[in-house]
């Protein structure tokens, strides 16, 4: 954000010293048609819903709630200018905001306009309706049907449905897909992904990977016992190794020493970071890539093609292994990939499932871990509480982890939840409204993209007692040393809610719990450098080198 524009913005907004940086994790609903449609109310709405309009007025229009509500065009928000609308605010030189600063905008909008804000006039996009009322967010979630429309990345939609329609066809997966195609695909993979027996199967393999990672960390320490400046790349390697073990049924070799820049694991990491961290640029700036292949779009497609090739390679390997293996010799619980291949008889389904898990998982989990480690290193009192809990549960630091042991790690889990509340990696969620609604006393037409910036609501005193204080004990029950207070269940939802809740959430939780348990039982983490601000790339995380000091305890 250039200084002049930021100064002009702040002159109309009162920002407190504890302002939380936050932004919705929402990138618009894309389609083969590039333009948003204009409704009769003058609002740009999602083109996906245009074909489903009924001639008769919706039932809600006859209710007193609707008739007493204010019209949509009276919802407060930044005013668009002719031709450029509000898109100019994100443009270089003349704009008010940069992509990395966009986290601040959600909180600024709330401070300026209140609990509901209309951000319209975005070229090629539906209106964004920011909702800062947890009760209204709950109402939106609870009123959705069996196929909620979650706004997704138009760039990914175009890649799946146009650029690589030859591969995906009618099997788009669970990311960037909506309606019956989404419901059918999710129903085919949901059971094996969410089964507790599947989760338990990966505890020991993920623990081994994490132990290998910690050995590598020790080898990376310098003479001051500090980790290197690019330690976030090492966390990405750990995350990729974990996801590869789950989604591709293999060890990718990410944690090997002297990994070359052109090695497959590093290429996967680089491709994921590029693809995901440029999504905000692709989506929030003028979408020229919709009309002609820009350099950024061309590289995005190249990276996505690389992902597809990697997934196909390892899923085909798993399929061949199943074909040649004597069924009578299979022992124990089948792997996730094996379950999907055996139940669906279609390796493409397993390939697309793996692709979606990797795309969504690598950067999300990596950045969440970066944030958690930074908070641990800068909060020694909280770190010590977790260490004491782990020392009590694991007197012998070499004791293998089990699900019952993880279930007793209340302080560790409370710490994770508190980091998500105050510094949530996924900084918001949203829905494209499937029908006309009344929200915060306004008439809102279907097709509008409702944004739920939970990192704002999760830090509002209205919904959380002593919201500005980092207090993991708020998540614990009294018998476990907790100090419960007011905590609205829809104020902080890092994994979303309902039918479109994050499919890989149980694996994400398992990976993070294993890493923190193994790390904090055996090591002390410190950060002795300049405090880091948080910024948005694709995720919300500390912006700077994570030069942690890591010593055995």
Curated annotation (Swiss-Prot):
The entry marks the following residues as binding heme, namely 502
InterPro entries documented for this protein: CYP11_CYP27_families (IPR050479), Cyt_P450 (IPR001128), Cyt_P450_E_grp-I (IPR002401), Cyt_P450_sf (IPR036396)
Biological processes annotated in GO:
tergite morphogenesis
EC number of the protein = 1.14.-.-
GO: which molecular function terms? heme binding; iron ion binding; monooxygenase activity; oxidoreductase activity, acting on paired donors, with incorporation or reduction of molecular oxygen
Q: Nuclease: is it a keyword of this entry?
A: no
GO annotation, cellular component aspect: mitochondrial membrane
Alphabetical list of Pfam families matching this protein: p450
Per the record, the coiled-coil ranges are: none
Where is this gene product found?
Mitochondrion membrane
Member of which family? Belongs to the cytochrome P450 family.
State what protein this is by name.
Answer: Probable cytochrome P450 301a1, mitochondrial
Native source organism of the sequence: Drosophila melanogaster
Q: Which gene encodes it?
A: Cyp301a1
